[in-house]
Amino acid sequence: MAQRTLVATFFLIFFLLTNLVCSKEIIVGGKTSSWKIPSSPSESLNKWAESLRFRVGDTLVWKYDEEKDSVLQVTKDAYINCNTTNPAANYSNGDTKVKLERSGPYFFISGSKSNCVEGEKLHIVVMSSRGGHTGGFFTGSSPSPAPSPALLGAPTVAPASGGSASSLTRQVGVLGFVGLLAIVLL
């Protein structure tokens, strides 16, 4: 009986640690100097974002000169119009980290309206969370009411097919293997 309790405890700890390891920090644009006005449409941060899969639990990281710029999280309408007056969140420390707490679209613009107008902005879509729970709006607190449709701005996009296996699939596979190993050893 004690061995089964030990195995169950091991599974629980392993599953929780695997969940933590699967989240990652992503530097916006792929390098520290990317939060700037793009020199051409092909260097748009949205082009960069289209090549990635963002997941609930990932963290976006911006590096920039806090004396010259900032990052605003805004609604879809504010994103389209580069409206900097009423952001949902304002980051200005030069080393901004935003944890993606829910699935769906996120919109970010430069705190400088002129920079935004010239293309310094980012729109990403976060894939559904591993297990279906989307968490709170900006924090990982207990479930809260659904975010305002105006802030979401668009429907959630389904994950593209043919990509790498999802984190949940990897976790189930690893847990299955460890479970089989535990049964064989007992």
From Swiss-Prot:
Extent of the signal sequence: 1-23
Family assignment from sequence similarity: Belongs to the early nodulin-like (ENODL) family.
Record-annotated disulphide pairs: C82-C116
Gene Ontology MF annotations: electron transfer activity
Top-rank taxon, per record: Eukaryota
GO CC list: plasma membrane; plasmodesma; plastid; side of membrane
Propeptide position ranges: 166-186
UniProt key word Repressor: no
Keyword terms: Cell membrane, Disulfide bond, Glycoprotein, GPI-anchor, Lipoprotein, Membrane, Signal
Topology class, membrane: Lipid-anchor; GPI-anchor
Entry keyword Lipoprotein: yes
Lipidation residue positions, type GPI-anchor amidated alanine: A165
Tissues expressed in: Mostly expressed in seedlings, siliques and flowers, and, to a lower extent, in roots, stems and seeds, but barely in leaves.
Pfam families associated with the record: Cu_bind_like (PF02298)
Role noted for this protein: May act as a carbohydrate transporter. Required, together with ENODL11, ENODL12, ENODL13, ENODL14 and ENODL15, for male-female communication and pollen tube reception and burst at the synergid cell surface of the female gametophyte.
PROSITE patterns associated with the record: PHYTOCYANIN (PS51485)
Disruption-associated phenotype: No visible phenotype. Plants lacking ENODL11, ENODL12, ENODL13, ENODL14 and ENODL15 have a reduced seed set due to aborted ovules as a result of pollen tubes failling to rupture and release their sperm cell cargo.
Ranges for domain Phytocyanin: 24-128
Name used for this protein in its record: Early nodulin-like protein 13
Localisation per UniProt entry: Cell membrane
Residues carrying covalently attached carbohydrate according to the record: N83, N90
InterPro entries in alphabetical order: Cupredoxin, ENL_dom, Phytocyanin-like, Phytocyanin_dom
